[in-house]
Amino acid sequence: MSDNDFWPDGYRCCVQLSFDYDSNSALVRRAPLDIVAQSRGRFAPNTAIPRILDLLDQHGIKATFFTPGWTVDNFTESCEEIVSRGHEMGAHGYLHERLAELSWE
């Protein structure tokens, strides 16, 4: 197979763009009472995700957002917006658990 047969429409490469959308999920486990840290973690759903989605839309780019289940449970609106704009969501654990500390159950 030649390169011309592999790449459609004259394209010569591809790029996969992904984001880790954690919000404050890691902080909830590590520092649940640190209000300043929790506030910083809310920047993603309230400011960063809308800006990123608008930028991706402007350029016609689709991306994958790897997101912990805790973020989906607690910031449902922003996750639904990601999907409604045609992006993919991927699993990223539930709450940044330390796997070595989890029981087999």
Name each region found by the language model.
Residues 1-105:
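Catalytic alpha-helical scaffold of carbohydrate-active enzymes acting on polysaccharides/glycoconjugates
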